């Protein structure tokens, strides 16, 4: 079907728009923006910071202009456990440390995927998906758990934040461009049957990725001294720890005991779903989600909070979110009322159409 807009139709659109109501809301939207003009103040009456189940929290950490929310959330759950166990409120872990290893591991798994798919054309959907993920920042719980399990953790002072960890676009773009160029080289070598040269080049490329990342964010420490004061001001010192030793010594956690629950009503409940394209560590924990009804997910989260344990969660945070207040609410913006349209869809419909 091909429909060409006519001048008569445009004239009708103008006529339909020409009323006082549209002029009033247009002035408000143009002056304040669509979201401000449609903000629903009624949400403030029911969104407060008083909860029936409270878990003691520490100071908020700030991912700044980076896609590391998944990593911050995982490390926040770990530092909550540390603070609770060792009475050290506001103890923080370095996000920069695990961010470094994420870049190296992602490059490694990217090169493997490119080599394995070298027999497919560049416009193959699988190959294009790999190319799109090159240099990416975003992630899931299993990705952070894989990094912690393999590389451990360090306190913030052992590897502090830097400009390029707070603002990752520059490094991510540089890594993506390099990895895509490397992909062309590796594909050509595989197609020519030069197996030994493939492995040689792969190692060379990984060394270059390491160099780029180290230049941008610094090299991660091999060892460090753990030094902190607990809530009673008592000094604690544990010298010459490796990051893995630190994690194994101070945390009693088995990541395999945890599962990510999701609510995707456009897919069958009671099934385990995976995102193999987003796995970041070869031999790590694969990304999986157990799809359950929303009531089950809610009940599980409440039980975990009642047990005194923080809950990692991920959501489409840019939808119905106000940065100034921190509100997340499906009734936050009355954009349908502003535009006089009906965009309501069920959650299943939103997911199926790419809206969710």
Q: What is the role of each PLM region?
A:
Residues 61, 140, 293, 355:
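Short, glycine/acidic-rich beta->alpha junctions
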Residues 64, 73, 157-161, 315:
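Glycine-rich, histidine-containing beta strand-loop boundary motifs that form or position
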Residues 199-304:
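Extended, H/D-rich, highly charged conserved domains that either
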Residues 94-228, 232:
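Papain-like cysteine protease catalytic cores
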Residues 130-134, 168, 172, 177-179, ...:
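Active-site-adjacent substructure of cysteine-protease-like catalytic cores
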Residues 72, 76, 80-81, 147, ...:
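Generic, well-ordered alpha-helical scaffold segments in large soluble proteins
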Residues 35-124, 130-139, 145-146:
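Long, well-ordered hydrophobic secondary-structure segments characteristic of membrane-embedded
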Residues 2-58:
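N-terminal regions that are enriched for targeting/export leaders
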């Amino acid at each position: 079907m091909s429909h060409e807009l006519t001048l008569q139709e445009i004239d009708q659109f103008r006529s339909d728009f020409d009323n006082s109501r549209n002029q009033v809301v247009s002035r408000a939207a143009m002056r304040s923006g669509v979201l401000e003009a449609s903000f629903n103040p009624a949400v403030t009456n029911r969104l407060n910071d008083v909860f029936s189940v409270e878990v003691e929290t520490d100071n908020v950490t700030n991912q700044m202009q980076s896609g590391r929310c998944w990593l911050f959330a995982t490390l926040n759950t770990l530092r909550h456990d540390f603070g609770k166990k060792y009475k050290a409120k506001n103890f923080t872990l370095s996000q920069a440390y695990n961010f470094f290893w994420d870049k190296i591991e992602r490059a490694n798994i990217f090169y493997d995927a490119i080599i394995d798919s070298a027999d497919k054309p560049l416009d193959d959907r699988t190959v294009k998906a790999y190319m799109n993920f090159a240099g990416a920042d975003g992630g899931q719980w299993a990705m952070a758990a894989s990094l912690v399990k393999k590389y451990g953790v360090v306190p913030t002072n052992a590897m502090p934040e830097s400009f390029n960890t707070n603002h990752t676009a520059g490094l991510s773009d540089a890594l993506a461009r390099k990895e895509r160029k490397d992909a062309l080289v590796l594909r050509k070598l595989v197609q020519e049957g030069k197996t030994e040269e493939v492995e040689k080049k792969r190692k060379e490329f990984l060394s270059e990725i390491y160099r780029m990342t180290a230049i941008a964010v610094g090299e991660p420490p091999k060892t460090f001294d753990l030094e902190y004061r607990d809530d009673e001001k008592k000094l604690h010192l544990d010298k010459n720890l490796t990051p893995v030793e630190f994690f194994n010594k101070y945390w009693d956690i088995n990541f395999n005991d945890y599962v990510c629950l999701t609510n995707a009503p456009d897919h069958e409940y009671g099934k385990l779903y995976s995102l193999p394209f987003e796995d970041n560590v070869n031999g790590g924990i694969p990304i999986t989600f157990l799809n359950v009804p929303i009531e089950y997910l809610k009940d599980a989260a409440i039980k975990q909070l009642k047990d005194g344990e923080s809950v990692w969660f991920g959501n489409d945070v840019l939808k119905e979110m106000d940065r100034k207040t921190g509100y997340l609410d499906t009734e936050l913006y009355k954009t349908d009322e502003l535009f006089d349209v009906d965009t309501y869809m069920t959650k299943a419909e939103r997911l199926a159409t790419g809206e969710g």
